[in-house]
Amino acid sequence: MMKPERKTHPLLMIINNSLIDLPTPSNISYLWNYGSLLGITLVFQIMTGIMLAMHYSDNMDLAFSSMIHISRDVNYGWMIRFFHGNGASFFFICLYVHIGRSIYYNSYKLNYTWNIGIIILLLTMATAFLGYVLPWGQMSFWGATVITNLLSAIPYIGMTIVNWLWGGFAVSNATLTRFFSLHFLLPFIISAMVMIHLLFLHQTGSNNPLGLNSNTDKIPFHQYFSIKDLITMMLFIMILSFLVLFSPNILGDPENYIPANPLVTPIHIQPEWYFLFAYAILRSIPNKLGGVIALLMSIMILFFLPIFSKNCFSTSFNKWSGMIFWSFINIIILLTWIGANPVEAPYIIFGQILSVLYFLTFFWMPYSMVLFQKIIELL
């Protein structure tokens, strides 16, 4: 009997094994849909980004004007711009939910997949920061100045690295040009890393809500989960479209509608909302080098989760770990709120307390899992 073309053609076989006949645990929930949402959003961001790059000028005298030109003169330019800007926010929402689900259901036990995922997170954060600088408004300019200047905290070579990054002794035309080039390049590197992420995932198979081996209970990805993914994609597009068409600036900063002026400092310099939790941790350390280390460790600590926790139980079965996890989510939300506020009392002390709790959570959760397992064994 003749096999279908998708099972014999060398290229179609790759798509077939990844999207059609992929053996998938039958009990995965909607929380497993965020991976496909991230893939669609990445493609969407690359497409809108290329269209914006066709009309953008990477010159400090023309960058702000080119953004106004895109919004006013280019056919549907305002829509492309707002879809790209708000699409980045939605990308990070999906990314954080995806990571949160992996922590909650112990998916970080798939070491290679998890580590590549964290590298993708770091690359995405770098891409988003570079993109935030491109409109060349007040917050773009001062955000670039403040955040890149943090590298000067590195002993001996810090200031040299900063000058090399800036292309001079201050944020200038050279800085904007290289930031634009890197912002254009990084999404394609992220796409390659996503392929590696999927390669490792399909080697081991996906995790499931029970946290158990599901080799005896798997079904094809298509049509069961492909339809399920399409429903969430439709909801995602509807919500994003509603935001873009009715409140496109709700997630942005009004300061960025003022052209960059190196002589006037904004009252409160802050990054985009999806970096505010890490920014609050940075500000909570009075020492500059200590703050930079804390900022890096707020993300890098995710690499150590598989080392900290060797437990086989999913957090969904462990009420103590569950309470710690949801407390951790509240800590991140509060840190985001504190990062959006000025550096003054009582935000300083609250930020310091929450930063300590943020890092302690990564030690409490594995310990609670071990304790819970010992109690189960005793019973």
Swiss-Prot record:
Keywords per UniProt: Electron transport, Heme, Iron, Membrane, Metal-binding, Mitochondrion, Mitochondrion inner membrane, Respiratory chain, Transmembrane, Transmembrane helix, Transport, Ubiquinone
Binding site for a ubiquinone: H202
Major location category of this protein: mitochondrion
GO BP terms, alphabetized: mitochondrial electron transport, ubiquinol to cytochrome c
Any one GO CC term of the record: respiratory chain complex III
Localisation per UniProt entry: Mitochondrion inner membrane
Membrane topology of the entry: Multi-pass membrane protein
Binding residues annotated for heme b b566, in chain numbering: H98, H197
Function: Component of the ubiquinol-cytochrome c reductase complex (complex III or cytochrome b-c1 complex) that is part of the mitochondrial respiratory chain. The b-c1 complex mediates electron transfer from ubiquinol to cytochrome c. Contributes to the generation of a proton gradient across the mitochondrial membrane that is then used for ATP synthesis.
Subunit: The main subunits of complex b-c1 are: cytochrome b, cytochrome c1 and the Rieske protein.
PANTHER family assigned to the protein according to its UniProt record, in alphabetical order: CYTOCHROME B
Similarity comment: family membership: Belongs to the cytochrome b family.
Protein's name in the database: Cytochrome b
Gene coding for it: mt:Cyt-b
